[in-house]
Amino acid sequence: MKLRKVGIIGTGHVGSHVAFSLALQGEVDELYMMDIDEKKAKAQAMDINDAVSYIPHKVTATAGPIESCGDCDVLVFSAGPLPNLYQDRLESLGDTVEVLKDVIPRIKKSGFDGFIISISNPADVVATYLCKHLNWNPKRIISSGTALDSARLQKELARIFNISNRTITAYCLGEHGGSAMVPWSHVYVQGKPLVELQQELPHRFPTLDHTQVLDDVKIGGYHVLAGKGSTEFGIASATTELIRAVFHDEKKVLPCSCYLDGQYGEEGIFASTPAVIGKVGIEDIFELKLTEEELALFKQSCAVIREYAHKAETL
């Protein structure tokens, strides 16, 4: 039986938490840690191995160069500059492109032919860049995109309505960043449209200030960043969920950034929308029927991604 092996490129706060989340949840057998700081990568591997006695599954962690990641089933790209509280995600593009220029030839040299889960910011632009310069099958590149934003949206709605977030279906779409939008016409509570519940049970489901809710969701990551210097647990859990869906061929519908090829009238970029995740990666993309206003907002968000994807090519 083939063991599941995941490589982590960038073993700082985020990458190390992804690795440990995979180990704790039993979604990996082997971890391969890679970082420009080789001592850190080795230390992260040692730390995980020290925890194995208290994990209910066998996990082996090693560290080494990117050129030796060819036998990994999945690569998690989490390398890049440290987050800056006063910097928009898009402003980190220059530093991230420099990392990509170093990493991509080394991935090619390794012979790696698996799946790539990209979680570095700016998420959608990085995934678009990786797909183009690796000349990869776009179905096999998934960016976490708005997976975490959508979780924050569900959390915020659950708080407002005093109801379990597990009963709420709600997505942030488009860019993982300032231009993200919410298709409010597709928000459901246990399968029932929120707009209907607001009419039938206004005491439980009051009218929302959509702009304020979305602003609170967008600022959520910055609150975490201000308090502890980085976001770790949320993105690690979201990444683990994506990898689980691939390894177990779950055919699970998750919000993530995937390659658009005509959906919503957009193509040639990665942007977030619900997608079916299974053993081939992105198996299908759910193109939601958006209102005219929602579609305009989604397209505005895609325009931001496209602008910075073009900019990345000039750096």
Role assignments for model-derived ranges:
Residues 15-16:
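N-terminal Rossmann-fold NAD(P) dinucleotide-binding loop
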Residues 11-12:
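Glycine-rich Rossmann-fold phosphate-binding loop(s) that bind the pyrophosphate
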Residues 54-115:
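Rossmann-like NAD(P)-binding element
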